[in-house]
């Protein structure tokens, strides 16, 4: 097995032959001998976080204090009916949280959604529907085939950079210019 990739970015290369993952950045939430799981962080859906919370019938959802234009992301092709929330550490504990790094958690329980826009909410968060998973050794094989580049993750790219700029920014962190990153196969 490669180094543990938990808490790092996977950046799709032009070698990947899968339209779903073309030009994606994936935040790896878990990586061990059982495989890997991550979330695509640069593919917005047409559903805003506000619309999602309103549909889930949380009280006073439209009066909460968060970015009203923040979109729900398509986290991957697996379990697309399930929510995955990457967020910064908070004082509040949530029902189903998993520590990815010292400051980043992955939560799959609805209580984190109910907290959004309230004082106890995580300062920064991403809401995804679906995830990406790999069987044991599958991700390592894809990396060996040059489908993915590996980069250190950072809060700016994860939470602040515009969704569609995240792939170029992640490449630039590796010294690959935007023009080279966009080059495809002939």
Curated annotation (Swiss-Prot):
One of its GO terms (cellular component) is cytosol. It holds the Pfam family DUF179. InterPro entries: AlgH-like. NCBIfam families: PRK00228.1-1. Belongs to the UPF0301 (AlgH) family. HAMAP family: UPF0301. PANTHER family: UNCHARACTERIZED PROTEIN YQGE, UPF0301 PROTEIN YQGE. This is UPF0301 protein APL_0232.
């Amino acid at each position: 097995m490669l180094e543990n990739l938990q808490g790092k970015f996977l950046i799709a290369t032009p070698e990947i032959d899968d339209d779903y993952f073309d030009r994606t950045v994936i935040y790896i939430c878990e990586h061990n001998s059982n495989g890997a799981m991550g979330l695509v962080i640069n593919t917005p859906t047409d559903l805003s976080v506000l619309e999602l919370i309103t549909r889930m019938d949380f009280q006073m959802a439209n009066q909460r204090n968060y970015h009203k234009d923040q979109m729900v992301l398509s986290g991957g092709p697996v379990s697309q009916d399930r929510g995955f929330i990457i967020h910064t550490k908070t004082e509040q504990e949530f029902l189903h949280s998993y520590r990815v790094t010292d400051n980043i958690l992955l939560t799959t329980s609805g209580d984190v959604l109910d907290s959004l826009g309230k004082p106890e909410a995580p300062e920064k968060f991403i809401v995804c529907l679906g995830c990406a998973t790999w069987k044991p050794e599958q991700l390592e094989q894809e990396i060996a085939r040059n489908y993915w580049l590996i980069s250190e993750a950072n809060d700016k790219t994860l939470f602040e950079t515009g969704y569609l700029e995240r792939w170029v920014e992640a490449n630039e962190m590796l010294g690959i210019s935007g023009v080279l990153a966009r080059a495809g196969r002939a």
